[in-house]
Each structure stands twice: as structure tokens, then as C-alpha cells.
């Protein structure tokens, strides 16, 4: 990013142990727009497949908010047992696990960031009407609606990626959109394949989401 663009980005420095997870979330920020306050914090909990990560930012020297990024358990059935087995209700495997992860995330937010400006986002591996998303929306978190899908699975469009904003911060959001640069393109141009080029298309299997924040 820094080599090919005009902006200067940094990786949020973290506090806390990540553990031995093969996948972890991270936060990259534009130093000309926001500054960090304290180090980013990984939230390790037995219910998480990958620990949640939060960073406190100050936007344009005045607006303070917390960004919390997440990656919930996937829908794959490998090693699923008991309540994590596919219940044939359309929510696939590990729905129970994802519900627990949603509730754990809410407990963390309530404990550490109660009544603060907060944006909660990530790959929740759940569609908008599924139990984990409904659990998150049952609080003071508002899911921001976007027109385009974020993922394609076996030719079917849907959104596994979501953005939630606390009641006291929603007036600072002026737009949200899904940038459709990944999911509609074939996997053989994925960045990890030999046929990949230097464009941003298919840089991931999920589409990024763009949020506009104002003071």
C-alpha cells in the first residue's frame, strides 16, 4: 500500500497474546486521517475461533471511537459435533459456536466499551437473518444495510460480512457500500494463484466494505 499509493498506512500495534491460531485479524490505518490511542487489544476467549481485535482511534483530532474486527467460525462441517452439527435449518455447521461467539463479543463490548462510540465489523460467517447476527442486533448495535453482496458460494450471492455501529455513533456514519471487486471474479485469478496479476481484483474471496465517517 505504501509503495504504490500516496497515503501512508501503518499496522495497529497489538497488546495481548494472539495464541497459536493459524488465522488472525489485523487493522491497518491511514496515519493522515486517524491516530491511535493505546495499543490494539486482542480478546482471547475459548469461544472464539480467532480472537477479536479492537483499536481505539481519534479521528481528525476530535472524534474518538473504537474499531472492533472479528472473524467467526466458518460454516464448514469438519470436526463438528453435537450442537455444532448442521441442524438442517439453513444455517449450516457450527451455528451454535457462532452464537456463542456473538454473545461473548457482546460481553466484551459491554465490559470494556459500554456507552462508547464503536464500530463492530468483520467476517461473521453468518447471513443477516441467522441467529448470530440477530443476537448482535438485539443490543444497541445497528447493522448497516448495503446493497451488494459480499460473498458468492456455489453461484449464490449473500453477505457474510457485516458492519454494526452503536446507537451513539450512528449519526457519524454518512454512507456504506460493498466494493464488488472480489466475489464475482473467478478464483483462478486469486492472488495466491500463478495467474494472478497486480490488480486489486480477486485480492480476497470476500468483498471489502467501505464506510464513510464524519465528525
Question: Which residues fall in each region the model found?
Answer:
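Divalent cation-coordinating acidic motifs and surrounding scaffolds
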Residues: 1-215
Amino acid at each position: 500500500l505504501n509503495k504504490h499509493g500516496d497515503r501512508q498506512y501503518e499496522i495497529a500495534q497489538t497488546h495481548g497474546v494472539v495464541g497459536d491460531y493459524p488465522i488472525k485479524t489485523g487493522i491497518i490505518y491511514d496515519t493522515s486521517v486517524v491516530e491511535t490511542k493505546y495499543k490494539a487489544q486482542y480478546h482471547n476467549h475459548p469461544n472464539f475461533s480467532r480472537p477479536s481485535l479492537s483499536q481505539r482511534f481519534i479521528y481528525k483530532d476530535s472524534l474518538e471511537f473504537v474499531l472492533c474486527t472479528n472473524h467467526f467460525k466458518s460454516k464448514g462441517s469438519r470436526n463438528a459435533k453435537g450442537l455444532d452439527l448442521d441442524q438442517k435449518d439453513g444455517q449450516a455447521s457450527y451455528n451454535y459456536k457462532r452464537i456463542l461467539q456473538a454473545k461473548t463479543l457482546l460481553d466484551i463490548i459491554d465490559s470494556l466499551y459500554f456507552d462508547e462510540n464503536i464500530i463492530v465489523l468483520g467476517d461473521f460467517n453468518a447471513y443477516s437473518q441467522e441467529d448470530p447476527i440477530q443476537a448482535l442486533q438485539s443490543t444497541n448495535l445497528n447493522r448497516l444495510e448495503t446493497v451488494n453482496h459480499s460473498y458468492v458460494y456455489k453461484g449464490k450471492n449473500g453477505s457474510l460480512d457485516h458492519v454494526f455501529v452503536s446507537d451513539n455513533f450512528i449519526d457519524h456514519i454518512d454512507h456504506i457500500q460493498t466494493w464488488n471487486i472480489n466475489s464475482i471474479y473467478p478464483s483462478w485469478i486469486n492472488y495466491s494463484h500463478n495467474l494472478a496479476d497486480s490488480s486489486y481484483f480477486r485480492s480476497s474471496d470476500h468483498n471489502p466494505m467501505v464506510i464513510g465517517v464524519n465528525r
